[in-house]
Design a protein with these regions (language model features):
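Membrane-water interface of transmembrane alpha-helices in multipass transporters/channels
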Residues: 5-7
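Soluble catalytic regions of large protease machineries
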Residues: 10-15, 21-177
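Interdomain coupling/hinge region of P-loop NTPase helicase/AAA+ cores
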Residues: 1-3
Length: 177
C-alpha cells in the first residue's frame, strides 16, 4: 500500500528535494539532474537522481566537493525555509552519506587539506582503530572541516538563490516529478 503524505510533508519534501536540485543545477561540475520527484518510494519521501554525462571510473577532489554540496542541499533548504528547529529527520541518510564520503576522502583518497598526507589508504574502521588517538582525532577534525565547508558553500548558494528554491519547490509540489 502506498503512503499518502500530508500537505506539510509534501511541502517539506518539495523544499528538501528542491534544495538538492538547486545545488546540482547551480554548482559547476555537479552531475546533471536526470529526475527529481516527491513521490514516496520505499522509505524515501522523494529523490533527486543525478547521472554523469560519461562513464565515471574515478572522481576528482572537485567532483567529490560537488557531491558533498548536493548532499547538503536538502538539509540546508529545510533550515533556510523552516528554521533550524524545524529541520526534519529526512536528511539523515544524506548526512550519513556525506559523512561516509568525507571520511573516505581523508582516509582512503588522501584528499586532505592537511600538509601531512600521512593518513591515506585506510580501508576499514579496523584500520582506524589501530591508529593512535592523535591521528584519529586529526581524521575526525578534517572530516568535520570538510563537512562544514560543504554546509557553508551550500548555505551561501541557497541564500543567494532562495527565489529559485521557492520556484523549484513549488514546481515539485505541483507536478510531483
Amino acid at each position: 500500500k502506498s503512503y499518502v503524505m500530508r500537505p506539510q510533508e509534501i511541502w517539506n519534501t518539495a523544499c528538501h528535494e528542491g534544495g538538492h536540485a538547486l545545488v546540482a543545477l547551480l554548482t559547476p561540475g555537479a552531475d546533471p539532474i536526470h529526475k527529481a520527484t516527491i513521490i514516496p518510494r520505499g522509505r524515501s519521501l522523494g529523490h533527486v537522481l543525478q547521472l554523469p554525462e560519461n562513464d565515471v571510473v574515478s572522481l576528482t577532489r572537485k567532483q567529490i566537493r560537488c557531491k558533498l554540496d548536493v548532499m547538503f542541499g536538502g538539509r540546508v533548504a529545510e533550515e533556510l525555509m523552516f528554521g533550524k528547529d524545524n529541520v526534519t529527520t529526512g536528511a539523515t541518510n544524506d548526512m550519513q552519506q556525506a559523512t561516509n564520503l568525507a571520511r573516505r576522502c581523508v582516509m582512503q583518497f588522501g584528499f586532505s587539506d592537511s600538509e601531512d598526507q600521512g593518513v591515506m589508504g585506510l580501508m576499514y574502521e579496523d584500520d582506524v582503530r589501530r591508529l593512535g588517538p592523535e591521528t584519529r582525532e586529526r581524521i575526525d577534525k578534517e572530516v568535520k572541516e570538510m563537512l562544514q565547508g560543504a554546509y557553508n558553500r551550500t548555505m551561501r548558494l541557497m541564500r543567494n538563490n532562495k527565489p529559485k528554491l521557492l520556484t523549484l519547490a513549488n514546481a515539485l509540489k505541483e507536478y510531483e516529478t
